């Protein structure tokens, strides 16, 4: 119990003055940060930069995957981006829990994500949002935030055609396979995903309690019965 209490006290020390922060600075002093990165690190002084660099050093592989070749398929980009953000975001949260006091959390969260953004074309706020969407399984919001409007996402749908025959057979819809393939090809047409994203952005989130527009009710017309003619009476 005494050992665990000691560890808890150690974790509660403020980062700027705590022993953990000083040890991080001492270890990072042996490997000075590259001037090119420091120059682009707006709001990060050298000491803060060294602390962030030292703490995230074990995750170099995931930092590199935030900036992937442009010719890489979109599906793989999404996969690597999600994996990297989950690992990096969880690591940052661990840092905030174990090394920061309550009043320091906001500052160091901002600094650590700003350091991560140096390895990506996206800003720190965007990366934090993508991490949040990934953790909450909000795929639609993730795609809207990550995929640019002019980038067709046909590669994300390409593998769906392979699974169509199996699905149709399992559900007894073999005769509808051609029709489903035709609809899928329309979805994969150039510009179609971009148009869908534009429509989603234009609509925006629907407020709670808001009702969907209803079609005007048509007035029922009373049909007057025709008077009986002499022929019908016979």
Swiss-Prot record:
<feature type="region of interest" description="CHD1 helical C-terminal domain (CHCT)">
    <location>
        <begin position="44"/>
        <end position="145"/>
    </location>
</feature>
<protein>
    <recommendedName>
        <fullName>CHD1 helical C-terminal domain containing protein 1</fullName>
    </recommendedName>
</protein>
<feature type="region of interest" description="Disordered">
    <location>
        <begin position="200"/>
        <end position="234"/>
    </location>
</feature>
<dbReference type="Pfam" id="PF13907">
    <property type="entry name" value="CHD1-like_C"/>
</dbReference>
<dbReference type="GO" id="GO:0005634">
    <property type="term" value="C:nucleus"/>
</dbReference>
<comment type="function">
    <text>May play a role in regulation of apoptosis.</text>
</comment>
<dbReference type="InterPro" id="IPR039880">
    <property type="entry name" value="CHCT1-like"/>
</dbReference>
<dbReference type="InterPro" id="IPR025260">
    <property type="entry name" value="CHD1-like_C"/>
</dbReference>
<keyword id="KW-0539">Nucleus</keyword>
<keyword id="KW-0963">Cytoplasm</keyword>
<feature type="region of interest" description="Disordered">
    <location>
        <begin position="1"/>
        <end position="38"/>
    </location>
</feature>
<dbReference type="GO" id="GO:0005737">
    <property type="term" value="C:cytoplasm"/>
</dbReference>
């Amino acid at each position: 119990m005494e050992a665990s209490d000691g560890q808890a006290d150690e974790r509660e020390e403020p980062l700027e003055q705590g022993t953990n922060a000083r040890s991080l600075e001492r270890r990072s002093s042996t490997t000075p940060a590259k001037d090119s990165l420091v120059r682009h690190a707006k709001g990060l002084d050298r000491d803060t930069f060294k602390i962030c660099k030292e703490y995230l050093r074990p995750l170099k592989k995931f930092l590199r995957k935030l900036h992937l070749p442009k010719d890489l398929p979109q599906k793989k980009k999404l996969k690597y981006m999600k994996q990297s953000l989950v690992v990096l975001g969880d690591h940052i949260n661990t840092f905030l829990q174990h090394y920061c006091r309550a009043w320091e959390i906001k500052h160091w969260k901002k600094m650590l994500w700003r350091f991560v953004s140096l390895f990506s074309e996206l800003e720190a706020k965007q990366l934090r949002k993508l991490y949040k969407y990934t953790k909450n399984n909000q795929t639609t919001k993730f795609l809207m935030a990550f995929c640019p409007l002019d980038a067709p996402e046909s590669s994300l749908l390409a593998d769906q055609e392979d699974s169509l025959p199996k699905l149709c057979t399992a559900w007894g819809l073999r005769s509808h396979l051609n029709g489903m393939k035709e609809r899928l090809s329309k979805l994969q047409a150039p510009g179609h995903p971009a148009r869908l994203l534009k429509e989603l952005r234009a609509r925006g989130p629907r407020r709670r309690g808001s009702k969907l527009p209803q079609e005007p009710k048509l007035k029922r017309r009373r049909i007057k019965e025709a008077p009986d003619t002499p022929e019908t009476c016979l």
